[in-house]
């Protein structure tokens, strides 16, 4: 009876307050006040080409305006100017000696020569000094092929050196530092550009790296022997212009010209960082950041970068059905789909679905459509949210936007730790703290943020105090030009979550400014916003309360549903990529594709839809999630009305048109729960899941399968034990 549709289906599968005050004074002294009127531009000449620039523009920036590239090692657009590599020396007419282009502001009428004999000779001299102590490691260096020193030595260096064996005693050697399981160090290659030091201090907010010694004895290190453990440590690999700091898990794996690169997005948190997936022979080898000023700038969190080895482990590669003896046994797709179809037909419409944190939007729409055709409306997200609050998008979005948080001048964090829940949102807050005199306070447990903040306490009743104007920090928020309140998504799963949400939302209406919405919910789940946008109910308990006879788990691996909560005869179907919590309780396991193996839309915490692109094929018999659901619909006799991705995207456009406009933000209105919330905010302390660095590394099925993430947790635990031992000895 089902043979014909089955063939088609299988085909488809092809005191802090004082610290704040002192910091504000210090920052105000460093940051110049923005003038009310834009300054008049001045004219300078770069290689005899006139350029109009604003006062304060450096020589390097002026040259860049007309496409003239000046070599540099230490300079980076997002870091403070150091001016210590001297590779950017240029000639300025009437100047007695070359000037450092990265650090020298232009003056009116200057004539700058970037390719004169003096400039070329200066660059050759600097390069000769750099190579004097640099080892000839290029054949065995992981940076080979994408090394700034290689490129600039070819373009601007001399063809010979005066430091020969006759006249020179030999190159120096520097001991390598062990700074953790992520960054490999070969410090003999270091050219002392100090990019890593400035990144750690300015962006990551940890002063672990620095310089010791002088002249030829200068070294980059951690002062005392310790690990460089921060949620952003991998970015020093991208910043390092030579092979001194490289990717330790990627060591000796591949050369740049051997790999294929695919632009995609990260889904291991709700930021939606833009990434480049590097692959070879159908294997993901590494992940690098891709620049997007609105989302992640050019940074990438460590979990997003290094957890890619989890894509090769604990994978589901064949459909499985649980046998009478309780064991899962691998079967063909035909057998698995028939087993699920039989359970569906016996359920009589008592079916529910739960979407987890790695589910793409297309699969969520396909699951919802399938259950609707089978007579069920019970589709829910694994993560909870307030009842009645999903009708208004502004209720669950980061309305100030990720980039917009840089402009905030007062922020209240409620039940969230952005440093580990969304590291690249935290970098924006730190940026505002450094450059915008941002004042930050938190309600919840004491947390280690990368900037000074005032902890108001952990009692939930403090939310009411602040929002009623009775607290001292209320005056700070009300006096700010762009205030923001950020609520942790996990906090809203509390019994009084709706009351907290409503109280903050009402207060934010008072704080709202033109073109500025201060109400924010920081999601931690890449699939949450998209699911709520297409009509999913919030919380796994919504599905559990329905007591279904068939339950679909779509990448739901957080362990929020157990067999004990379900009817004894409930048939659980898991669709996902990894053997994790969801697969362990399933009666049928249908192997899906991971985010690097499919084209799928994810909506980040600010409501921006972006898509992943496939870099490799799914392993074994695994298929894209929506194709599995399409095939299953054929088998149960309720075929879904789309056979390819374009048709499915057309269906998505009917459901939520804004979700097909990739990369664009759809403005949301004011937050506020539907109806009146009568419950008051309960007492008790607010808690946070991700309090420490060790909590950050394993939060989903992919990172839990990653050996590198396991090494990170071991390293953090080891260092903490050593620190505790030192403290006990000191006492």
Swiss-Prot record:
<keyword id="KW-0830">Ubiquinone</keyword>
<feature type="binding site">
    <location>
        <position position="190"/>
    </location>
    <ligand>
        <name>[4Fe-4S] cluster 2</name>
    </ligand>
</feature>
<feature type="binding site">
    <location>
        <position position="193"/>
    </location>
    <ligand>
        <name>[4Fe-4S] cluster 2</name>
    </ligand>
</feature>
<dbReference type="GO" id="GO:0072593">
    <property type="term" value="P:reactive oxygen species metabolic process"/>
</dbReference>
<feature type="binding site">
    <location>
        <position position="147"/>
    </location>
    <ligand>
        <name>[4Fe-4S] cluster 1</name>
    </ligand>
</feature>
<comment type="subunit">
    <text>Complex I is composed of about 45 different subunits.</text>
</comment>
<feature type="binding site">
    <location>
        <position position="134"/>
    </location>
    <ligand>
        <name>[4Fe-4S] cluster 1</name>
    </ligand>
</feature>
<keyword id="KW-0004">4Fe-4S</keyword>
<feature type="transit peptide" description="Mitochondrion">
    <location>
        <begin position="1"/>
        <end position="27"/>
    </location>
</feature>
<keyword id="KW-0809">Transit peptide</keyword>
<comment type="function">
    <text>Core subunit of the mitochondrial membrane respiratory chain NADH dehydrogenase (Complex I) that is believed to belong to the minimal assembly required for catalysis. Complex I functions in the transfer of electrons from NADH to the respiratory chain. The immediate electron acceptor for the enzyme is believed to be ubiquinone. This is the largest subunit of complex I and it is a component of the iron-sulfur (IP) fragment of the enzyme. It may form part of the active site crevice where NADH is oxidized.</text>
</comment>
<keyword id="KW-0472">Membrane</keyword>
<dbReference type="GO" id="GO:0008137">
    <property type="term" value="F:NADH dehydrogenase (ubiquinone) activity"/>
</dbReference>
<keyword id="KW-0999">Mitochondrion inner membrane</keyword>
<feature type="binding site">
    <location>
        <position position="85"/>
    </location>
    <ligand>
        <name>[2Fe-2S] cluster</name>
    </ligand>
</feature>
<feature type="binding site">
    <location>
        <position position="88"/>
    </location>
    <ligand>
        <name>[2Fe-2S] cluster</name>
    </ligand>
</feature>
<feature type="domain" description="4Fe-4S Mo/W bis-MGD-type">
    <location>
        <begin position="259"/>
        <end position="315"/>
    </location>
</feature>
<feature type="binding site">
    <location>
        <position position="74"/>
    </location>
    <ligand>
        <name>[2Fe-2S] cluster</name>
    </ligand>
</feature>
<keyword id="KW-0001">2Fe-2S</keyword>
<dbReference type="InterPro" id="IPR050123">
    <property type="entry name" value="Prok_molybdopt-oxidoreductase"/>
</dbReference>
<dbReference type="GO" id="GO:0005743">
    <property type="term" value="C:mitochondrial inner membrane"/>
</dbReference>
<keyword id="KW-0408">Iron</keyword>
<dbReference type="GO" id="GO:0051537">
    <property type="term" value="F:2 iron, 2 sulfur cluster binding"/>
</dbReference>
<dbReference type="GO" id="GO:0045271">
    <property type="term" value="C:respiratory chain complex I"/>
</dbReference>
<dbReference type="Pfam" id="PF00384">
    <property type="entry name" value="Molybdopterin"/>
</dbReference>
<keyword id="KW-0520">NAD</keyword>
<dbReference type="Pfam" id="PF09326">
    <property type="entry name" value="NADH_dhqG_C"/>
</dbReference>
<dbReference type="InterPro" id="IPR036010">
    <property type="entry name" value="2Fe-2S_ferredoxin-like_sf"/>
</dbReference>
<keyword id="KW-1278">Translocase</keyword>
<dbReference type="GO" id="GO:0051539">
    <property type="term" value="F:4 iron, 4 sulfur cluster binding"/>
</dbReference>
<feature type="domain" description="4Fe-4S His(Cys)3-ligated-type">
    <location>
        <begin position="118"/>
        <end position="157"/>
    </location>
</feature>
<dbReference type="Pfam" id="PF22151">
    <property type="entry name" value="Fer4_NDSU1"/>
</dbReference>
<dbReference type="Pfam" id="PF10588">
    <property type="entry name" value="NADH-G_4Fe-4S_3"/>
</dbReference>
<dbReference type="InterPro" id="IPR006963">
    <property type="entry name" value="Mopterin_OxRdtase_4Fe-4S_dom"/>
</dbReference>
<comment type="similarity">
    <text>Belongs to the complex I 75 kDa subunit family.</text>
</comment>
<feature type="binding site">
    <location>
        <position position="102"/>
    </location>
    <ligand>
        <name>[2Fe-2S] cluster</name>
    </ligand>
</feature>
<dbReference type="GO" id="GO:0046872">
    <property type="term" value="F:metal ion binding"/>
</dbReference>
<dbReference type="GO" id="GO:0032981">
    <property type="term" value="P:mitochondrial respiratory chain complex I assembly"/>
</dbReference>
<keyword id="KW-0249">Electron transport</keyword>
<feature type="binding site">
    <location>
        <position position="141"/>
    </location>
    <ligand>
        <name>[4Fe-4S] cluster 1</name>
    </ligand>
</feature>
<dbReference type="InterPro" id="IPR010228">
    <property type="entry name" value="NADH_UbQ_OxRdtase_Gsu"/>
</dbReference>
<dbReference type="InterPro" id="IPR000283">
    <property type="entry name" value="NADH_UbQ_OxRdtase_75kDa_su_CS"/>
</dbReference>
